From Swiss-Prot:
It comes from the Eukaryota. Residues 196-365 form the PCI domain. It comes from Phaeosphaeria nodorum (strain SN15 / ATCC MYA-4574 / FGSC 10173) (Glume blotch fungus). Its main location: cytoplasm. This is Eukaryotic translation initiation factor 3 subunit M.
Length: 441
């Protein structure tokens, strides 16, 4: 896979290396039954006229024979042959003219090595990527070829560590929105085929974000928007639909596909009763649209319970019977659903079997609108009043403490003054005694 930029070091002149590669291709073709192959002679004639670009065209086309090489041709020979071709092509000022064809050849199945063909192709494509200038748009086409091979060989783990560099590459290539979209969709397809639904959805959203407002209603944008919407609705761990509703292309479904948009709004902010009303109104539509009805029912129950927890008020608790009624389940199933909503990360709390109550520690708002702001304002007012009360108590205690300290200080001063007064009284008596003594003398 792509890594630091490097070079291929091969000794020999262009003419010598061309002759070597052409001879190797002729040998392969003759082993495949093409006895008339004379690439070596054709390229020699062109070299006499110094038509190097024409020589390279023939070599690139001839390289298709490597995909059908006999099984006895080992991986080392396969890689060495392609490295030689890449070295020759890189010497041309028109290198961009040849690399797309080479990538196309490598994207095709390598019939000579069905088990290792994907690995061989990825090795060569990685070499092309890493020997190409970091800012060259050729890298974009090479990466698309790499993605095609990874998808064909179900080798997503090879791609995963490279995804973190994708934005940096696109910036270096100064990629236009349409080309970025194509790349994001290719990554999404690879992830989807590999069962990586979260990654597939992430890159599908990134592709949708490349549509400008004026193209949000285009047929292609509509198709991708519906694909993203269906993926979000049926994904077992996706509960926040704000990422969808913020997109212009999704908002455009309000006109082109109003039923789909209505369903999205229900999952974004409504409850199970609303979803059941929707199903009654559009009987059979969910199944006809290719959606998993059971998955939608389960998700709607979890979202409904999350909404109930968020709006539980200051009591921060929900009785079992209230949960059972809202989720349209039996009382015996309540604890199972509460555990599921906790596992989904929508709510935190604990069950009180003794009181048949769910005690809520934390809840998640599905949408944050006027009602939620009012609730936040109410809670802030409550906290402010509570803190005001605490502050008043603290100030009263502080005042009492200061008063006590002042009283203690006053008492200490009084004691000190009394002691000083006593000492002064004793000192006045002593001189009189001395005077009496002096008078006797």
């Amino acid at each position: 896979m792509p890594g630091p930029k490097n070079t291929i070091l091969i000794e020999g002149s262009f003419e010598e290396l061309t002759d070597e590669f052409a001879q190797y291709i002729d040998t392969l073709k003759k082993s495949q039954g093409e006895e008339a192959s004379n690439l070596q002679g054709e390229t020699a004639e062109l070299l006499k006229e110094n038509k190097k670009d024409d020589v390279l065209k023939k070599l690139v086309v001839g390289a298709q024979a490597l995909n059908q090489a006999p099984e006895k041709v080992c991986a080392i020979e396969f890689i060495a042959a392609y490295n030689l071709l890449i070295h020759l092509v890189n010497q041309s000022p028109s290198v961009n003219m040849y690399l797309p064809k080479i990538c196309q050849n490598l994207s095709a199945p390598i019939s000579s090595s069905p088990q290792n063909g994907g690995g061989l192709a990825l090795s060569i494509l990685s070499t092309i990527f890493n020997t190409t200038s970091a800012g060259s748009e050729v890298r974009y086409h090479v990466l698309l070829a790499i993605l095609r091979v990874i998808r064909a060989t179900s080798n997503f783990e090879t791609l995963r560590p490279q995804l973190k560099q994708l934005d940096k590459w696109l910036e270096a290539w100064e990629t236009e929105e349409e080309d970025s979209r194509k790349l994001y969709l290719a990554v999404s397809d690879v992830a989807s085929d590999a069962g990586e639904s979260e990654q597939a959805y992430t890159y599908l959203l990134r592709a949708l974000r490349t549509y400008p407002s004026e193209e949000a209603s285009s047929p292609e944008a509509r198709e991708l928007s519906l694909r993203a919407l269906k993926s979000a609705l049926t994904h077992p761990t996706h509960f926040d639909f704000q990422d969808l509703t913020d997109l212009d292309s999704i908002q455009a479904l309000r006109n082109s596909d109003p039923i789909f948009f209505q369903l999205l709004e229900i999952f974004n902010s409504d409850l199970l009763d609303d979803y059941n009303d929707f199903k009654d109104e559009h009987d059979g539509w969910v199944e006809e649209s290719g959606l998993d009805g059971a998955a939608l029912n389960r998700k709607m129950r979890l979202l409904t319970l999350a909404s109930m927890a968020a709006s539980a008020g200051q009591t921060r608790s929900l009785p079992y019977d209230k949960i059972a009624k809202a989720l349209q389940i039996s009382s015996e199933e309540v604890e199972m659903w509460v555990i599921d909503v906790i596992r989904a990360g929508l709510v935190e709390g604990k069950l009180s079997q003794l009181n048949q109550t769910f005690l809520i520690h934390r809840s998640t708002y599905r949408v944050f609108g006027d009602n939620q702001w009012r609730e936040v304002s109410s809670r802030l007012d409550m906290w402010r009043n509570s803190l005001t009360g605490v502050l008043q108590v603290i100030q009263a205690e502080k005042q009492r403490f200061l008063q006590e300290k002042e009283e203690e200080a006053n008492k200490a001063d009084n004691k000190y003054d009394s002691a000083r007064g006593f000492q002064r009284g004793g000192q006045r008596k002593q001189p009189r005694a001395l005077d009496d003594d002096m008078g006797l003398e």
